[in-house]
């Protein structure tokens, strides 16, 4: 009863996607981001969702496909929200604090990249750019996301690549295809980059993540990162 009371009080502070107070929503306790806080059997109730969740936990990546307008991006985000909420519940001593921090945790742990035909390997992984009149090598958006993730964080991070079919995946992803595999996540995949061309401020961040070894740069995808 105490746990349910805490949940009810925190629900009053939350809103749904359309701005409606979550507490006024129909059956708020069954909301996908709330239920994991009180129902340990959540993953056992929906065989289809269980299958997707099990697959994602095992492979750490998943592609949702189908015609435009079939809620692929929505489903991807809901799956991420559910897994983050479940992890937050399991790793929080205080249920009230966990629910209060839920929205901030979702915002910091779900990374959405809108793909488009002009996306390049340089934009996505690493490549040359001009900085103060000099040509330098800078990490792309994916490498920046990886740099910002705490590898010891028990709450998973999710990268949602929206409209991925609009890019040449082989050309844009490069070494990421291999680095995403579980067997490569600890050792990483070497990138064909001269680290002397990388700005010093970027070098430190990469070193802190263990991505530079023997003057070589490695693409290392954290084990707590899902696609």
Predicted segment positions?
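AAA+ P-loop NTPase catalytic core and its hallmark functional loops
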Residues: 44-227
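C-terminal accessory module of base-excision DNA glycosylases/AP lyases that mediates lesion recognition
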Residues: 2-46
């Amino acid at each position: 009863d105490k746990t349910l009371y805490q949940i009810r009080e925190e629900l009053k502070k939350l809103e749904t996607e359309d701005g409606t107070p979550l507490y006024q929503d129909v059956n708020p306790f069954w909301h996908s981001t709330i239920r994991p806080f009180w129902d340990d059997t959540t993953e056992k109730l929906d065989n289809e969702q269980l299958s997707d969740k099990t697959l994602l936990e095992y492979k750490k990546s998943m592609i949702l496909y189908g015609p435009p307008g079939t809620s692929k991006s929505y489903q991807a985000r809901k799956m991420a929200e559910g897994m983050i909420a479940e992890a937050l519940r399991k790793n929080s001593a205080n249920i009230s604090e966990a629910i209060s921090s839920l929205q901030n945790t979702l915002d910091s742990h779900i990374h959405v990249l809108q793909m488009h035909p002009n996306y390049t390997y340089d934009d996505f992984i690493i490549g040359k750019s001009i900085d103060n009149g000099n040509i330098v090598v800078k990490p792309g958006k994916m490498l920046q996301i990886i740099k910002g993730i705490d590898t010891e964080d028990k709450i998973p991070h999710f990268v949602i690549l929206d409209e991925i079919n609009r890019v040449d995946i082989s050309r844009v992803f490069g070494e990421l295809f291999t680095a995403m595999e579980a067997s490569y996540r600890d050792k990483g995949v070497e990138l064909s980059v001269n680290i002397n061309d990388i700005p010093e401020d970027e070098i430190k961040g990469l070193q802190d993540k263990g991505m530079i070894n023997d003057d070589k740069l490695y693409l290392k995808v954290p084990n707590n990162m899902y696609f």
